[in-house]
């Protein structure tokens, strides 16, 4: 059996669901990048400066807490990062959310942009 045959046997409703989920994740990343006025390229880059890393960690936090996305999928969407990087970013922002009013306000504002209802 060839790769083409295998891929043709995947149910189209399953593929639509997978791609639909990625659209949701990408929207969250886009909203974060727009909020911080940085490009999507910067969000997925290897740049570790605080001006880029913090929004990226907030995107990790939102993808993890607002979806059922596996950590490795979040990492793939954010430039091929390892699941342990995602765990670190999510934990860091989670701690800040609990202890820092500014971080809480930023995240709540971004959540409202993602889900205005």
Q: How would you name each of these model-derived features?
A:
Residues 1-18, 25:
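Conserved C-terminal helix/linker of AAA+ ATPases
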Residues 42-117:
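Terminal-proximal interaction/regulatory segments of ATP-powered molecular machines
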Residues 19-20, 51:
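Residue-level marker of alpha-helix boundaries and capping positions
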Residues 18-19, 61:
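A short, ordered amphipathic alpha-helix with a cationic face
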Residues 14, 31, 35, 113:
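Residues that form generic nucleotide/phosphate-binding pockets
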Residues 20-46:
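Basic, low-complexity segments
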Residues 2, 26-27, 33-34, 67-76:
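Short, charged amphipathic recognition helices of the HTH superfamily
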